Amino acid sequence: MTTTIDKNQWCGQFKRCNGCKLQSECMVKPEEMFPVMEDGKYVDKWAIRTTAMIARELGKQLDEDARLCSLSVFDA
C-alpha cells in the first residue's frame, strides 16, 4: 500500500498564522515531501522540523510570559 501525503492540502486546512512570522520556515522542502525510511522506521522530516519550530516559538512565548509575570510581581 502506498500513501501519498500532499503537504499543501494538509497545511491548507489550517488558517495561516502570520503572527509568528514563521510561514516561510513552515514551507515543505523538496527532500521533505515524503517520509523516508531510517533505521527501519518511517521518518517525516517535515513534521519533525515544524514540530521543533513550533516548540521553539512556544518556548519563547513562555519565557516572555514568565518575564512579564515577574515584572508585574514587583509592581504590586
Swiss-Prot record:
The keyword Methyltransferase does not apply. Pfam families: Ral. Keywords: Host-virus interaction, Inhibition of host innate immune response by virus, Restriction-modification system evasion by virus, Viral immunoevasion. One of its GO terms (biological process) is symbiont-mediated evasion of host restriction-modification system. InterPro entries: Antirestriction_protein_Ral. Ral interferes with the cleavage of DNA by E.coli EcoK restriction-modification system, by modifying the activity of the host methylase. This modulation allows incoming, unmodified phages to escape the host's restriction system. Belongs to the lambda phage ral family. This is Restriction inhibitor protein ral.
